[in-house]
């Protein structure tokens, strides 16, 4: 069993920063130029689902988050150059990700799951709200780590143009 440091170790990535949470909704495609344009003024917090698209577009996230317990989640990061990008992994997320993620990995504990709450309390760590969504978890992390502003990109909460995800992310 691999011991993972707790995600508050990288809270400075978010503290007093303008954090852009990037989801894999179809609207992300039209926002890629804006992400490039403002890259130096924002902290990009990407869901695992969109990380590959961002990297292929030359947009390197400041952090990536994965919360899903499904065993195939490793496919979101397999083959990506993530050596310098911290990953926040929810305590109940698929451990398969650890076999393929090349960069530093930090654990986040969630409210609503007793074992995670107990561990967080025992070690003095924060526990985060998930709302059943990776973007909700990312939002609570950004807020608890005192982000100045939080902006959503690609968090559509709808079928934009009849699509549930961005072009290249449809089946991952």
Predicted regions and their residues:
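Active-site/ligand-binding-proximal alpha/beta "capping" segment
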Residues: 96-157
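Short, polar loop motifs at secondary-structure junctions
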Residues: 48-52, 89-96
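Glycine-rich phosphate/pyrophosphate-binding loops
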Residues: 50-68, 142-166
């Amino acid at each position: 069993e691999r011991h993972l440091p707790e995600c508050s170790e990288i809270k400075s990535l978010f503290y007093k920063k303008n954090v852009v949470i990037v989801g894999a909704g179809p609207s992300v495609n039209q926002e890629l130029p804006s992400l490039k344009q403002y890259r130096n003024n924002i902290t990009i917090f990407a869901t695992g689902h969109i990380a590959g698209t961002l990297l292929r577009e030359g947009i390197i996230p400041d952090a990536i988050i994965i919360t899903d317990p499904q065993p195939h989640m490793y496919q979101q990061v397999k083959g990506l150059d993530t050596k310098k990008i911290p990953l926040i992994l929810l305590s109940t997320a698929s451990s398969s990700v650890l076999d393929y993620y090349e960069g530093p990995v930090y654990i986040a504990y969630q409210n609503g799951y007793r074992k995670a709450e107990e561990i967080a309390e025992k070690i003095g760590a924060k526990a985060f709200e998930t709302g059943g969504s990776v973007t909700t978890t990312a939002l609570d992390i950004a807020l608890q780590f005192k982000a100045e502003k939080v902006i959503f990109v690609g968090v559509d909460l709808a079928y934009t143009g009849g699509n549930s995800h961005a072009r290249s992310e449809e089946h991952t």
